[in-house]
């Protein structure tokens, strides 16, 4: 029971991922959230943090273009909504993980 409690508490913690100044508008950085490779993206003052793996074929999304509120997998063109992780263009049919993001005092934090 103690192990389960500690695991649940850890999962709810905010993790520091980047300084706001390290991610220019339109930029992105690779980060780790909850031991998962993730991508932190910035659009104006908004930050998004998504799992950095295409659910279709496991390709990293790191170099994919951002368009129409989503990120495009550079391999087969699947697009995922940055807010929800939902696939919005084939061939992907499964969502990717999206992490909650919070900005405090010039620092960006994320959590599952």
Where in this protein do the model-derived segments appear?
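A conserved active-site-flanking secondary-structure segment within enzyme catalytic domains
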Residues: 90-91
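N-terminal pre-ligand scaffold of iron-sulfur
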Residues: 5-68, 81-82, 86, 95-112
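Short cysteine clusters
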Residues: 54, 73-76
């Amino acid at each position: 029971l103690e192990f389960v409690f500690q695991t649940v508490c850890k999962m709810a913690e905010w993790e520091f991922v980047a300084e706001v100044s390290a991610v220019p508008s339109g930029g992105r950085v690779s980060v780790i959230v909850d031991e998962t490779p993730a991508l932190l993206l910035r659009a104006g003052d908004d930050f998004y943090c998504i799992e950095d793996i295409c659910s279709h074929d496991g390709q990293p999304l790191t170099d994919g273009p951002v368009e129409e509120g989503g990120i495009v997998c550079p391999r087969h063109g699947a697009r995922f909504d940055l807010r929800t992780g939902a696939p919005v263009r084939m061939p992907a049919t499964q969502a990717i993980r999206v992490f909650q993001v919070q900005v405090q005092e010039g620092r960006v934090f994320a959590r599952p």
